[in-house]
From Swiss-Prot:
GO terms for biological process: menaquinone biosynthetic process; methylation. One of its GO terms (molecular function) is demethylmenaquinone methyltransferase activity. It comes from the Bacteria. InterPro entries: SAM-dependent_MTases_sf, UbiE/COQ5_MeTrFase, UbiE/COQ5_MeTrFase_CS. Keywords: Menaquinone biosynthesis, Methyltransferase, S-adenosyl-L-methionine, Transferase. S-adenosyl-L-methionine binds at T62, D80, D122, G123, S139. This is Demethylmenaquinone methyltransferase. Belongs to the class I-like SAM-binding methyltransferase superfamily. MenG/UbiE family. It comes from Parafrankia sp. (strain EAN1pec).
Length: 254
């Protein structure tokens, strides 16, 4: 199995996620000790969802977060450049629709609230018109693109004035003893656990390396601000292991 390097070549990153797609959700739940659900909930709250809002979920993976957004009544486009992830998302949407007694349409499915549509796309060149969405979000994906500033500018472009951005990403624990223990976990325990539960454990070596190289909360906030977003702030989760950054596209009343 191959893994991506920290130069984050798009074809390598996409291939890596294709490899892990089948067991991606299970592996993440194990590696995060179940905290991934809490992080998804916090991201949904940051978006301030409401019925009828148009939401773009970039790096949506298996559309786990997208389905939660749709359950709040939003109409969601789940966008990813890994075709393996989108295939897994399609299966999960079809299963959810079958359980709900509703048929899944081509590329999308009802979720008991809004609707989820799947789209293949690169975060550096989003295939959507300017101002198409009320809310845009990327969870654990910004770290995997070669040019995060370009991705943030693209997210700004497709958001309407006054629309909201939420970025959920691994960050820096705020308490030094936790930070030390966490970095030790990343480099020693995480690869070992991944070997036991993942279909591509080498991919999680990349995960650990990319988290260690990722900037802290304040630096990411400045990058978001430099891309043109306003009212940038963040909320630490799990002591800063993860942070949700929230920002607004200027020009609206929100």
């Amino acid at each position: 199995m191959s893994r991506a390097g920290l130069d984050k070549k798009p074809d390598q990153v996409a291939a890596m996620f294709d490899q892990v797609a089948r067991r991606y959700d299970v592996t993440n739940a194990v590696l995060s000790a179940g905290l991934d659900r809490t992080w998804r909930t916090a991201t949904a709250r940051a978006l301030a969802l409401a019925p009828g809002l148009r939401v773009l979920d970039v790096a949506a993976g298996t559309a786990t977060s997208s389905r939660a957004f749709a359950a709040a009544g939003a109409d969601v486009v789940a966008c990813d450049f890994s075709l393996g992830m989108l295939a897994q998302a399609r299966r999960r949407l079809a299963d959810a629709a079958a359980r709900a007694g509703a048929g899944a349409g081509t590329g999308g499915a009802g979720t008991g609230g809004g609707r989820v549509l799947l789209a293949a796309g690169d975060g550096l060149r989003l295939p959507f018109a300017d101002g198409s969405f009320d809310r845009v979000t990327i969870s654990f994906g910004l770290r995997n693109v070669a040019e995060g500033d370009v991705c943030l500018a693209e997210l700004l472009r497709v958001t309407r004035p006054g629309g909201v951005l939420a970025v959920c990403e691994f960050s820096r624990p705020v308490w030094r003893p936790v930070r030390t223990a966490y970095m030790e976990y990343l480099m020693r325990a995480l690869p070992a656990v991944a070997r036991a539960v993942s279909s591509s454990p080498d991919s999680y070596v990349y995960l650990a390396e990319s988290i260690r190289a990722w900037p802290g909360q304040a630096a990411l906030a400045e990058t978001i601000r430099a891309a043109g977003w306003t009212r940038v702030g963040w909320r630490n989760l799990s002591g800063g292991i993860v942070a949700v950054h929230r920002a607004v596209r200027p020009g609206g009343d929100d």
